[in-house]
Amino acid sequence: SQTYDESKWAKAAAAAKDVIELAKTSGLYELYTIAPKIGTLDMYRPPVHPEYSTKDYPDGWANIDPLLSYKSNFDGSVQGSKNPELIFTRTSDGTGTINDWMYQALPRTISGNNRLCVTQKQVNAYAMNDGRTISEAANTGDYVTTGFTTEAYSENNPFLPAKVSLMYNKREPRFYASIAYNGSVWEAASASEPRYRNQQIFYYRGTEDGKQGFKEECPLTGMTLKKFYNSEDSRTDGGYVIEKTEMTIRYAEIL
């Protein structure tokens, strides 16, 4: 029925609470976390907080990598059977579906279909790295919509190489794990030919991956989905694509 019924929300909340209590008593479900590696980038970690920066998870974030802990759920870095965050999943059937989404998002430059886009509204929903909304950050000058980055791409600067709009600076880890924007780098590490690796992609009109004439094989919003992309993924000759797990229900969605 399409009739609004608040009791449905109550039932959903009660069911979610049951799962949370089950997780607490059985240890069956928990958020998937990864310890920070040596040299973990400060750029996508939350700013220093006097109470939480030095405490381990779940009381703080000192012992986790916030970006990889989230990204690994989607990009195939961890097998579904070994991920305590997953409640209901599909692997064999789901992998093909997810990798097809990824193919639709991959830039034409690296042999993708280059057709998937995300909306500005969705991008604006991602917070800053300190948890504030972009509107709140704009009031203090920490979120701007003019200007571009100037530092070259490197292992220490993977998300904001030169010529990227400053509106994408200091965003939360989930943003960098999920969204590709003008100037994002696609690693394609498994590509056999170096020319396909670490490609900085732009979607401006007239560029290889932008709109060309009447052709619309491009992200019309100038942004696409990178959520299910693994840095090793490449559909070029000699490359391979990591298998992913389709997660229908995650514990994070219950909390």
Tell me what each language-model feature is.
Residues 1, 243-255:
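Extended amphipathic alpha-helical segments enriched in small hydrophobics
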Residues 2-206:
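An aromatic- and glycine-enriched ligand-binding surface/loop that stacks and positions planar moieties
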Residues 50-53, 222, 252:
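A generic alpha-helix propensity feature with a strong bias for hydrophobic helices
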Residues 85-86, 173, 177, 223-227, ...:
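Flexible, active-site-adjacent loop/turn segments at secondary-structure boundaries
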Residues 161-162, 230, 247:
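Short secondary-structure boundary micro-motifs
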Residues 193-241:
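Extended glycan-interaction surfaces of carbohydrate-active proteins
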